[in-house]
């Protein structure tokens, strides 16, 4: 199973009916653990990049239901991929 980081605005502010990012996350979670990266928490230390993150699971797109758990600081170098999503 892959470990994928998602760097994005707070998910509570995302419009689930219009934003394709949540649909992408919903499909990715079948094959990967999704880590939601807190944008303002990224820092660099001893050749490693760290950030606060939490596990994210999209439960329902229609009902805008999601679960965030296991808040912790992680080494971003350990992720298989990081998806950057930013509103224009």
Residue ranges and their predicted role:
Residues 1-88:
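ATP-binding N-terminal substructure of ATP-dependent carboxylate-amine bond-forming enzymes
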């Amino acid at each position: 199973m892959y470990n994928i980081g998602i760097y994005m605005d707070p998910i509570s502010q995302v419009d689930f009916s219009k934003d394709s990012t949540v649909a992408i996350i919903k499909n990715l979670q079948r094959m990967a653990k999704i880590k939601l990266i807190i944008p303002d928490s990224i820092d660099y230390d001893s050749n490693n990049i760290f950030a606060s993150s939490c596990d994210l699971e999209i439960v329902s797109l229609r009902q805008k239901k999601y679960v965030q758990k296991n808040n912790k600081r992680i080494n971003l170098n350990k992720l298989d991929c990081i998806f950057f999503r930013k509103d224009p």
